[in-house]
Design a protein with these regions (language model features):
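Peripheral, non-transmembrane regulatory/ligand-interaction domains of membrane transport proteins
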Residues: 1-219
Length: 220
């Protein structure tokens, strides 16, 4: 599923693509792949990289394209309620595409937030930074829930040692490790992006500082 988003005091969905809009793709199907690779000429290798669940935060280039991969938190059903997943931001001079192979809460919330606050996102660097900032906000939200779950599991273990409580605690602790690794990786990406987007038009030190502070707060 893809959406074409234009920044008009926040991101507003439109019916078709035009240069400099943001194309957000979640759970891409064959139609989305064809649009991205045939119409926008997005490198297929980038889409394959984003599909790898183990991809770490990094950047890559091909011709005039830049791929930025960050990791974001995801709440799911099952024995492991929280995981982290990759999301790819693919850009060139006229195109901004985000691709995620899962349906997330973060992206719709981010879009709604820009509308509520009337946020203007003037360029691709700021969009990437704001998405990283949003990831930190959601990491913090889920970390609070995880810490509450850990405290509850530890309390249960004090009463009686049961295998299911011990396994639950181990899974939650493993999730914390994954979260911390992803947050640190995203923080490193901010520095890399600053070195890539050095032109004056891309400079926004206040936003960079806010992103780094939020990531450090999320780091457990």
């Amino acid at each position: 599923m893809r959406k074409y988003l234009y920044c008009e005091n926040g991101f507003v969905e439109k019916s078709q693509w035009m240069p400099n809009c943001w194309v957000n793709v979640e759970c891409p199907d064959q139609s989305d792949f064809e649009f991205l690779t045939k119409e926008l000429k997005v490198p297929e290798a980038f889409l394959e990289d984003i599909a790898d669940m183990d991809e770490r935060p990094r950047t890559d280039t091909e011709d005039n394209w830049l791929l930025t991969i960050i990791r974001i938190p995801l709440q799911q059903q099952g024995s492991i309620p929280y995981i982290t997943i990759p999301i790819g931001i693919i850009t060139n001079n006229e195109i901004i595409v985000t691709v995620c192979y899962h349906s997330t809460e973060m992206i719709p919330d981010f879009i709604d937030h820009t509308r509520r606050k009337g946020i203007i996102v003037p360029n691709k660097f700021e969009l990437i930074l704001r998405l990283i900032y949003s990831s930190a906000v959601w990491f913090l939200k889920y970390l609070k829930q995880i810490n509450n779950d850990v405290a509850a599991a530890e309390k249960e273990l004090e009463r009686s040692i049961r295998n299911e409580d011990l396994l639950r605690l181990m899974k939650l602790q493993k999730t914390l490790v994954y979260f911390n690794t992803s947050i640190r990786g995203n923080e490193v990406m901010v520095g890399k992006l600053q070195s890539i987007f050095q032109e004056k038009d891309y400079q926004n030190r206040d936003l960079v500082e806010d992103v780094v502070i939020e990531l450090k707060q999320a780091y457990n």
